[in-house]
Each structure stands twice: as C-alpha cells, then as structure tokens.
C-alpha cells in the first residue's frame, strides 16, 4: 500500500518581494566603459590546472639574497626545480666576492643561459622577499640580454626561499 504525500502549493510572492527582484536586475547593467574585474586565480588553482594540462608550461623565478650569498631558482608550475644556482655553484668562493654587486649579475647570467638551453622563453612570475628595486632591475636586465622575459614581479613577505617549490635532487643541476 502506497503512502500518498500531501500536495503543497507554492506561496504567492508578496508585492514587496517582486519590487526587490526588479531593482536587483536593473542594478546589474553598468555604464558602457565599465570593465569587469578579472578574477584572481590562486596558486593552488593554477596547480590543479597545470596537472590537467601538462602541455601548458609556466615557469617561476625565485630570488633570495642572504648576507653572504645569492640564490636564483627556476621552477615549473607544479614546483619541481628546473634550474638552481647560487654564488657557490658559479665558483664564487670568498665571502668578499659573494657580497659584491657583480655576483648577482654573474649568477643571473648563468641561470639565464641554462634556462635558454632548456628552451625556456618566458618566466611567468618573479618572486623576491625584499622590495629592493635595484636588485630586481639587474636581474631583469641580465635576463633580457639572453632573451628571457619576466612577465610579472611579486614581492613575497614570507622569507623562505623554498616557498611553493619541492626540491628534487634529480631535477637540480
């Protein structure tokens, strides 16, 4: 034996509710020169998209300047290290030489050469933990000379150099 459900009728809308609906619809239309804001896509969302589309390659440049050393790392979207160089790996051994401004140029030039050899043309983002524009400019210039272009610069407040990347010894140079 079936149990019959009671039939319920939808309540009619009150006049004030109808007015609210109409006013909301009219506010949606904007002036002709209005541009909608682009949605910010978080790094995690980008990661998911990268895993779905492995052919779409984007690379990030991480820069970290310590008191006695300079680190430059290029990673892919997933976080695997493609190129990693420091003053020590460029055979600059003494502390005095590591502190000099020329070390940054030599390290960035060597990173750029390796990146071009691996067929990297664009770096999507450039992360650095300080807001020192001089350092950023020197890196940008040395990368431009070799034909590498950085599309966007970002200052990261978190000081860890290993931010957003997983280091794998097999991938490192």
UniProtKB/Swiss-Prot annotation:
Coiled coil: none annotated. GO terms for biological process: translation. InterPro entries: Ribosomal_uS11, Ribosomal_uS11_sf. It comes from the Eukaryota. Its main location: mitochondrion. Transmembrane segments: none annotated. GO terms for molecular function: structural constituent of ribosome. It is found in: Mitochondrion. Gene3D superfamilies: Ribosomal protein S11 (3.30.420.80). Keywords: Mitochondrion, Ribonucleoprotein, Ribosomal protein. GO terms for cellular component: mitochondrion; ribonucleoprotein complex; ribosome. The keyword Ribosomal protein applies. Belongs to the universal ribosomal protein uS11 family. HAMAP family: Ribosomal_uS11. This is Small ribosomal subunit protein uS11m. It comes from Acanthamoeba castellanii (Amoeba). The gene is RPS11.
């Amino acid at each position: 034996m079936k149990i019959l459900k009671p039939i319920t009728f939808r309540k009619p809308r009150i006049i004030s509710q109808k007015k609210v609906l109409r006013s909301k619809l009219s506010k949606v239309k904007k002036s002709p020169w209005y541009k909608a804001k682009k949605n910010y896509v978080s790094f995690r969302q980008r990661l998911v998209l990268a895993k779905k589309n492995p052919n779409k390659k984007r690379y990030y440049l991480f820069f970290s300047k310590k008191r006695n050393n300079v680190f430059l790392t290029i990673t892919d979207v997933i976080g695997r290290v493609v190129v990693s160089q420091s003053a020590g790996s460029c055979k600059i051994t003494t502390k005095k030489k590591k502190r000099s401004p020329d070390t940054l140029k030599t390290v960035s030039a060597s990173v750029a050469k390796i990146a071009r050899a691996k067929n990297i043309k664009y770096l999507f983002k450039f992360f650095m933990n300080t807001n020192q524009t001089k350092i950023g400019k020197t890196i940008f210039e040395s990368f431009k000379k070799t034909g590498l272009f950085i599309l966007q610069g970002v200052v990261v407040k978190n000081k860890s150099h290993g931010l957003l990347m997983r280091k794998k010894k097999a991938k490192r140079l």
